[in-house]
Amino acid sequence: MKFSTFDINDEFIANIDYTEEDSRYVGIIYITSKTAQGVVCMAEFDEYFLDYDDMIEWSKRYIKRNLL
């Protein structure tokens, strides 16, 4: 399993645990707070992407639409 993390805004961090096989990415997105412990929300995904950067951009859009 691979791991990626990035800041969403001043309050939250996105964490992504995923596996990659060819163009298929399967994983979990979970959002944590910069000021409190624990997971704020999470979602699973099983999608096809062109590459890692495409997966990250999709994740950012997904988080904005569905999680925060």
UniProtKB/Swiss-Prot annotation:
InterPro entries: DUF5487
Any matching Pfam family: DUF5487
Protein name as it appears in the record: Uncharacterized 8.2 kDa protein in Gp46-Gp47 intergenic region
Originating organism: Enterobacteria phage T4
